[in-house]
Design a protein with these regions (language model features):
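A mid-sequence, solvent-exposed acidic-amphipathic segment
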Residues: 174-218
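C-terminal functional extensions of proteins
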Residues: 231-302
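Residues at the starts of beta-strands that form the adenosine-phosphate
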Residues: 167, 190, 242
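Structural motif
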Residues: 167, 219-220
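Electropositive, gly/pro-rich neighborhoods at or near active sites that engage anionic ligands
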Residues: 2-184
Length: 302
């Protein structure tokens, strides 16, 4: 009990210091555009590589054993650091908006990001620029973390607009099943899927990249593969594709539809933070047939 009280006290201290610092400081920590501005960039045809706390921590070796479902890899860390500092035409870099703004977050999220900033401040300042324009990687976490839900509908509207009349290629882990069973992809012209390993996808990075490059550049590429997606989005942008590191956006959308107040499991899909990577059977035969018809290739660790 005493340890729990101490931990909560520390969280509260980080939050209060951070809240005061952000309200008083005349120096801008980092320039991070809003979630709406980030979505607008995607609608203009930009690709995005997103860095959450996991990807950022991988760069400065805070997680020596890797992060969930991706083991550590020296080459991967180097690429993540390289892309974080990149300035490629038609490609943007997303970092967490809560590094500079916490007053719109629920308390648990405000505690988390306040502690994250202060315990990683030296490393963050080493790798992040004070002058580079970043975008908000939290487009994939647009609902649950926020007290103000007013932007949610607009973000969803812009997301659907991004897919409208586009041929969409989803490159995802087995059982991710982005957009399956909801209307996110309803306006897309055609949907195809390449399924990849749900764990340690970076081991077959070259194989994944070369397979995608066999596809037409006019397609919108959606990537849901953790830090592997962060790197793929950059390499594909260099090749002339529009590639979006989409992350958990589909799951967030499912929670938004259900007006969930916490992370809950979703039928037919792997929800890493709730059920983990599991092989869920698609019980609806019609839905299963649609899904299987969209799969054009599978890439394994073998």
């Amino acid at each position: 009990m005493g340890l729990k009280i101490l931990k909560n006290f520390k969280k509260n201290i980080y939050w209060r210091i951070n809240k005061y610092s952000l309200s008083k400081s005349e120096n801008i920590r980092y320039i991070i555009k809003s979630r709406i501005e980030t979505m607008d960039k995607l609608l203009e045809g930009h690709s995005i590589s997103r860095y959450g706390d996991g990807e950022l921590s991988l760069i400065y070796k805070k997680k020596k054993n890797g992060i969930n479902y991706q083991e550590d890899n020296i080459e991967m860390r180097k690429r993540l650091a390289e892309i974080l500092k990149s300035d490629l035409d038609k490609h943007i870099v997303g970092i967490p908006g809560p590094l500079v703004k916490i007053d719109d977050l629920i308390l648990g999220e405000a505690y988390f990001w306040s502690k994250y900033y202060y315990t990683n401040k030296t490393n963050l300042n080493k790798y992040l620029s004070k002058t580079k324009v970043y975008y908000d990687q939290m487009i994939s976490r647009f609902y649950l973390p926020y007290t103000d839900k007013n932007d949610c509908e607009l973000i969803v509207e812009k997301l659907k607009q991004l897919f409208k009349d586009r041929n969409v290629l989803i490159v995802e882990g087995e059982n991710t099943r982005f957009g399956l069973g909801n209307e996110l992809l309803l306006l897309a012209k055609k949907v195809k899927r390449i399924l990849c390993p749900p764990k340690n996808a970076y081991k077959v990075y070259d194989k994944i990249l070369e397979r995608i490059k066999l596809e037409n550049k006019g397609q919108l590429i959606l990537l849901a593969l953790g830090p592997t997606a962060t790197i793929l989005a950059y390499d594909l942008a260099k090749e002339g594709y529009q590639a979006v590191d989409i992350g958990h956006m589909d799951i967030e959308y499912e929670w938004y539809l259900r007006k969930a107040d916490r992370k809950i499991d979703i039928e037919n899909k792997a929800v890493n933070e709730v059920s983990g990577v599991v092989n869920k059977e698609i019980k609806d035969k019609e839905l299963k047939a649609v899904y299987e018809s969209q799969i054009i290739d599978r890439i394994s660790l073998d």
